[in-house]
A protein has these predicted regions:
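Serine-esterase "nucleophile elbow" of acetyl-processing enzymes
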Residues: 32-88, 98-106
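Acidic-and-aromatic substrate-binding clefts and catalytic sites of carbohydrate-active enzymes
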Residues: 89-93
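Alpha-helical cap/lid subdomain in secreted, periplasmic
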Residues: 2-5, 9, 75-78, 94-224
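Bacterial N-terminal signal peptides
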Residues: 13-26
Length: 224
C-alpha cells in the first residue's frame, strides 16, 4: 500500500508537540514538587555529616535516619530542618575536605558521623582521630554545636585495633568538649534482620532505631 507523504510533516509536528507537552508537564511537576519541599527559611539548620550510613544507602531519604529526625523535629514543634550531608564511601579525610560546603548552609548543629570507612579499610586510628578533631573544630569555629557519633568494629578486626578505633571517638569528643553518642549503630549493627544483605547498611527499620537512639543526645541541644 502506498503511503500518503503529505501526512508526514503533520505527523512529525504531532510528535514534536507531544514531546514538548510531556517535557512541560514533567517540568511543572518538578517545580510543584520543589515548591512543596521548599524549606522554611527561618528554620535553624542541622547538618548530618557522614557516609553511606547517613546518606541512606538502600533506603529512601525519608526512611534514612536523618529523614526520620527531620520528621520528628517537625512533629514535636522544633523549627529545624535537616540537611543530609552523607557521602557514600567517605572517610574522615574526605569529610575534612568538604567541611566548607557543609558550613555554607550555616548549621546551628552538626551531627558528625564519620569513621566507619576508616575502620573498614584499616586506616590509622591516630590520623582518624586527628581528622575528627579538625572536623569538629571547623564546625565549632563556624558557630555550630557538635554531636559526634562514634563507631565500633566487628571482633574480626582484632581487639587492639578495635579498641584504639573506639577510643579515638571518645578522645576526640573529650578534647573538643562535644557530646558523644558512643555507637551510632547501637542495637542495629550485627543484627541480620536490621541490615541489608551486605550486612553493613541498615534497613528502614534499622534506621528507625538509629533515629530513636540518637534523639536523646540531640534534644538537649535544641531550642524552640
Amino acid at each position: 500500500m502506498r503511503r500518503d507523504r503529505s501526512l508526514l510533516p503533520v505527523l512529525g509536528w504531532l510528535v514534536v508537540l507531544a514531546v514538548v507537552g510531556a517535557l512541560a508537564l514533567a517540568g511543572a511537576l518538578r517545580v510543584a514538587e520543589a515548591q512543596r519541599a521548599t524549606p522554611d527559611p527561618t528554620a535553624r539548620v542541622i547538618v548530618v555529616f557522614g557516609d553511606s550510613l547517613t546518606a541512606g544507602y538502600g533506603v529512601t531519604p525519608a526512611e534514612a535516619y536523618p529523614g526520620r529526625l527531620h520528621a520528628r523535629l517537625a512533629a514535636e514543634g522544633y523549627r529545624y530542618r535537616i540537611v543530609n550531608a552523607g557521602v557514600s564511601g567517605d572517610t574522615t579525610a574526605g569529610g575534612l575536605r568538604r567541611v566548607d560546603w557543609a558550613l555554607s548552609v550555616k548549621p546551628s548543629i552538626a551531627i558528625v558521623a564519620l569513621g566507619a570507612n576508616d575502620g573498614l579499610r584499616g586506616q590509622s586510628t591516630v590520623e582518624m582521630e586527628q581528622n575528627l578533631e579538625r572536623i569538629v573544630e571547623r564546625f565549632q569555629s563556624g558557630g555550630a554545636r557538635v554531636l559526634l557519633a562514634g563507631m565500633r568494629l566487628p571482633p574480626n578486626y582484632g581487639g587492639r585495633y578495635a579498641g584504639e578505633f573506639e577510643r579515638a571517638f571518645a578522645q576526640a569528643a573529650s578534647r573538643r568538649g562535644v557530646v558523644l553518642m558512643p555507637f551510632l549503630l547501637e542495637g542495629v549493627g550485627g543484627e541480620p534482620s536490621l541490615n541489608l544483605p551486605d550486612g553493613i547498611h541498615p534497613t528502614a527499620e534499622g534506621h528507625r532505631i538509629i533515629a530513636d537512639r540518637l534523639w536523646p543526645y540531640l534534644v538537649p541541644m535544641l531550642s524552640k
